[in-house]
């Protein structure tokens, strides 16, 4: 029979109640499973919490829980490198804690995040994520995070009825879960339902302001839906909150500055980024910014980089760069291929302000066809 533990998180100085939650725990499971759940609450509710890894053979359960916490914090930072580190940590977690659902869910989220950013092959990442989610649900069929992740992936596969049921069930099991709101917002964004995506991400960020992936999704939605100054203001706020440079935010902010004509500020931000060796989300933003600053003089360099990469294997984040360098014809060819491949970005690309002229042209064609 499960134990139900009631936990209250109270500020030591003010004695103010920060949060209270209940946790169901099977006493037959290792203590590390319970500790991971407690640590989950601490990470979500205490800004900038930081624990060092514990080197002790006397407390293996605590050591496993701290390993999970370190992975969770790397995932929260949401940089290309931190997500890769988190992936390695969570793989270790599921091998040492195979009965714990939390690392499986985080492992799945890392795979999806890396695929979204163009840092891993999408189909393989989604397949691996599904395997992790199914394992989590095998252990605990009522895990709201796993159900939310499965709702996200089902929606990405156009299984919308299944997706809606899974999200509804996840919300019922854990009302006001920042993770479930985040997954649902991400699905709405990728499907082009930007208004609903924004409402959901606002709910998520209000509950979990420390998870950078949530904030970055809000930033991208703002860029797609609001005046550029609004997105810049939010990006500057995020940048000031980060003691460590986040290359994703930096690359977006550099692009914003170049779009506004603030080339010196854009150049200063570009200096904080690593040289482009691939075509992930950060590198594409960096190259696009350089094109805005330097124009035709850098076009050949970008084309050489594109020529050295198999563009049939990359995802939709590169399309604005292809449109800028090669023009509409090549863009349309790549976009149609991405639609056939069910690329994660294929449905939302026309909302990208960098592709506004293409969107307007397609809308005009649609109006003409309707009139005919």
Residue ranges and their predicted role:
Residues 72, 109, 116, 152, ...:
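Residue-level recognition of tetratricopeptide repeat
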Residues 71-80, 108, 112-120, 157-158, ...:
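Short coil/turn linking the two alpha-helices of tandem helical-hairpin repeats
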Residues 198-372:
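Alpha-helical protein-protein interaction modules
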Residues 66, 103, 110, 146, ...:
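The tetratricopeptide repeat
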Residues 91-121, 340-348:
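Short, charge-rich amphipathic alpha-helical segments embedded
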Residues 1-76, 81-82:
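Catalytic-center loop of serine/cysteine hydrolases
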Residues 82-88, 117-135, 156-169, 190-203, ...:
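Structural signature of tandem alpha-helical TPR/SEL1-like repeats
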